[in-house]
Amino acid sequence: EAGHTVDVIGPKEGETYVGKHGYPQKAELSAKDAKAKNYDLVIIPGGTSPDHMRRSEHMVAFVREAVKLKKPLAAICHGPWMLCSTDVLKGTRATSYMSIVDDVRNAGANWVDEACVVDSKSGRSTVITSRTPDDLGAFMKAILSLIETGSAQGTKGKPVAPGWVK
């Protein structure tokens, strides 16, 4: 809708992956063949796909290459699971779906209950994270702003985590 080119990268080129709501998505390129240097930003989807993605050595290697090149990264819902496998979360502010709060914290992030968090410390990848599909508007606003202007702002939103998540 915003006029940007998007490539769907998966463990295997041509493989169709079906999300938890039944929507199919075909990988246009394998992670083994994809080069992070060719992309302005890497978006990691939510749902259970990041759990499968992080089991692929080539998917992890692609995201690690993006981190090394200081490419911006965006992850929503369970997407930060993939970031946990790359060391990019160390020292960042980040958010995620509440069931992976401990994973995000164990990866070194300061987890916060905000709709969209943008961590853009100098000298490293900008990391954009969001909690749930309800935060998709704030998530995409931050991504598009970063692509189009070079900077982005987070959105606090209403807290959604239960009291035991502190």
Can you annotate each of these PLM segments?
Residues 77:
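Catalytic nucleophile serine of serine hydrolases
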Residues 1-69, 73, 81-93, 101-166:
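Extended, subdomain-level signal for the structured scaffold at the beginning of enzyme domains
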